[in-house]
């Protein structure tokens, strides 16, 4: 079965009740509407993919090259463009057509999805917050080293700092994917997905919701 995907906006979290009157924490995602602006096929492009556009934007804010792409597809400019890769044995031309509109209804209640977004930026962070280091002693002679990382390498051996050594630095603002989340409810009337659990990113951030690659749909 071909993987489905849609661009959307994270609106925030809330809680609902299931059929057993148990509280279920859900994230509300405004899914679509998306419009197909380009189709890539294995024969022509060497891989199979579909390009989706999402979000309102004033046409005067779109540069000429991108405006030309939308004009070729015969659709109004959108704020976001994303290309979703399909399996090589899946014919994008048979599954989609340029100008086709995708809504939240491409998913069903109980489906499992992978959600990709940009995590919240935390700014410059130390090793205890960024990597979960224990830190050093609070007493017994410890002098102003309580939150320091400690040694990052020997003097003579190895005589250098290994690549990838965990240190302080900018934390967050990374592309993160949370896998195997269950779609609790599809609200087709409002174009909203209620996804069980938390998803990456801030409220109002762009997310990509795709069929779970490891588990598949229910």
Curated annotation (Swiss-Prot):
PROSITE patterns: RIBOSOMAL_L3 (PS00474). One of its GO terms (molecular function) is structural constituent of ribosome. GO terms for biological process: translation. It comes from the Bacteria. One of its GO terms (cellular component) is cytosolic large ribosomal subunit. InterPro entries: Ribosomal_uL3 (IPR000597), Ribosomal_uL3_bac/org-type (IPR019927), Ribosomal_uL3_CS (IPR019926), Transl_B-barrel_sf (IPR009000). Keywords: Ribonucleoprotein, Ribosomal protein, RNA-binding, rRNA-binding. Coiled coil: none annotated. One of the primary rRNA binding proteins, it binds directly near the 3'-end of the 23S rRNA, where it nucleates assembly of the 50S subunit. This is Large ribosomal subunit protein uL3.
